[in-house]
Amino acid sequence: MKLPIYLDYAATCPVDERVVKKMMEFLSIDGNFGNPASRSHKFGWQAEEAVDVARNHIADLIGADSREIVFTSGATEADNLALKGVMRFYQTKGKHLITCKTEHKAILDTCRQLEREGFEVTYLDPKSDGLIDLEELKSVIRDDTVLVSIMHANNEIGVVQDIAKIGEICRERKVLFHTDATQSVGKLPINLSELKVDLLSMSSHKLYGPKGIGALYVCRKPRVRLEAIIHGGGHERGMRSGTLPVHQIVGMGEAYRIAKEEMATEMPRLTALRDRLYNGLKDIEETYVNGSMEQRLGNNLNISFNYVEGESLMMALRDIAVSSGSACTSASLEPSYVLRALGLNDELAHSSIRFTVGRYTTEEEIDYSIGLVKSAVKKLRDLSPLWDMFKEGIDLNSIEWTHH
C-alpha cells in the first residue's frame, strides 16, 4: 500500500493508463497531430475522424446524438456557455432563471454575473437532506422564466436530484432545463433520449480523462439555441470557437468508452468501499452524515465530526488525501456554503470531511483510513475543552461567550 492514500476522487482523478496510451498517438510527428479543421489533406481528415469517434463515445455514455456534443475547456466553461448562452439568446422571452443554493460555484458565480447584466435569479433552498422541493420549484416558475439549472449530483455531499421529474416539470411549463452532471456522468446511468434535459455539462478529469477538456450537451429535438461566449473560426457549429485539442478530446472519448464498459461492475464495488468506510466511522460519537444516504452517489461520504475542527483533522490525516468542501473553494477557510444551505451550524459545517473513493481505491486503503480517522478524532477531542464540556453534559448553545 502506497502512502498517502488518495480519497479525493470528486476533486480529480488520475488519468487511466489506457487513456494516456491513446492520447500519445495524437501528439508528435510520428502520430496523428493534424488540425481537424484542415479539410485539404490527410492529417486533417485523420484528426477529424478521431474527434468524431470520441464524440460518439461521449454521446453513447449519456444516450445522446453525437451532433449534440459541444466540446469546451471543461465543465466550468460548459456551465458558463449553457447559462449565459441561453439567457442572452432568449432574453426577449424573459430574464428569469432558477437554480439552487448548493450548486457548484461555476453555476452560482455565473448567475451572479447574469444578475449584474440585468437578469433575475431565484435561488432555491434545499431540504435538510440536500434535495430540492419539487413543489417549491413549480411555485417559483414564472411566465418570464427561461431556464432552470439544477445539478444532477452534488460535488460535496453526493446527493442526487431527481432530474427526470425536474425535466418533466420544466417541459410542461415550457422552460429549458440545464443540469451540471460533472459528478454523475459515468457513475449513474443517464439516458438523454428519455430524459427531458435540454442542456447537460460534463467533464473529462472526473472520469479518469485529462484535465482541460469537457463538453456541453445541447439538445437538438426540441432544438435549443444559444449565443456563443467565445468567438473565432466558428468551430463546434458556431457554439464554441477554437482549434479542437485532439489529444484531449481523444482522451475524454476513451475515458467515457471505458466508463460505459465498466460502470455496471465498478459502481457496486465503489459503493461497497464507501459503505465499508461508513460502517467503520459511524460508531464514533457525535458524527453526522451530511446529505441523504439514499439518494446519493455510491462513491461519496461527507461526514461531520462534532467538536473537531475540519482543518485540524485534515492536517492530522496527513496520510490520507481528503477535502473539506469542494476543491474549488477549499483554499478559503469559510465553512462550506453547501452544508450551511442544508441548515448545519458553523461548527458542524467546519468539522466536515469529504471522502470520495475511485477506480484505484482498495479495501486495505479503506481499513487503514478508518483506523487513522478514529485515532485522529480521538486525539483532537482529547485536546478540546468543548468536548470535555459536552461530555459533562453542558449545553454549549446556552453558554454566553464574551470577548475580553
Swiss-Prot record:
Pathway entry: Cofactor biosynthesis; iron-sulfur cluster biosynthesis
Q: Which PROSITE patterns does the record associate with it?
A: AA_TRANSFER_CLASS_5 (PS00595)
For binding [2Fe-2S] cluster, which residues are annotated in this chain's numbering? C328
Superkingdom of this protein's organism: Bacteria
Active site as annotated = C328 (cysteine persulfide intermediate)
Picking any one GO biological process from the record gives: [2Fe-2S] cluster assembly
Its main localization is cytoplasm
Q: Which family does it belong to?
A: Belongs to the class-V pyridoxal-phosphate-dependent aminotransferase family. NifS/IscS subfamily.
Q: Which InterPro entries match?
A: Aminotrans_V_dom (IPR000192), Aminotrans_V_PyrdxlP_BS (IPR020578), Cys_deSase_IscS (IPR010240), Cysteine_dSase (IPR016454), PyrdxlP-dep_Trfase (IPR015424), PyrdxlP-dep_Trfase_major (IPR015421), PyrdxlP-dep_Trfase_small (IPR015422)
Please list every transmembrane segment annotated in the UniProt record, as residue ranges: none
Q: Does the keyword tRNA processing apply?
A: no
Q: How does it assemble?
A: Homodimer. Forms a heterotetramer with IscU, interacts with other sulfur acceptors.
Query: For this protein, what is the EC number?
Result: 2.8.1.7
Q: Which reaction does it catalyse?
A: (sulfur carrier)-H + L-cysteine = (sulfur carrier)-SH + L-alanine
Localized where? Answer: Cytoplasm
Q: Which GO terms describe its cellular component?
A: L-cysteine desulfurase complex
Cofactor(s) recorded for this entry are: pyridoxal 5'-phosphate
User: What does this protein's UniProt record list under function?
Assistant: Master enzyme that delivers sulfur to a number of partners involved in Fe-S cluster assembly, tRNA modification or cofactor biosynthesis. Catalyzes the removal of elemental sulfur atoms from cysteine to produce alanine. Functions as a sulfur delivery protein for Fe-S cluster synthesis onto IscU, an Fe-S scaffold assembly protein, as well as other S acceptor proteins.
Does the keyword Cytoplasm belong to this entry? Answer: yes
A molecular function (GO) term: cysteine desulfurase activity
Annotated protein name in UniProt: Cysteine desulfurase IscS
Q: List the disulfide bonds.
A: none
Q: Provide the binding site for pyridoxal 5'-phosphate.
A: A75, T76, N155, Q183, S203, S204, H205, T243
Sorted alphabetically, the keyword list is: 2Fe-2S, Cytoplasm, Iron, Iron-sulfur, Metal-binding, Pyridoxal phosphate, Transferase
The species this protein belongs to is: Histophilus somni (strain 2336)
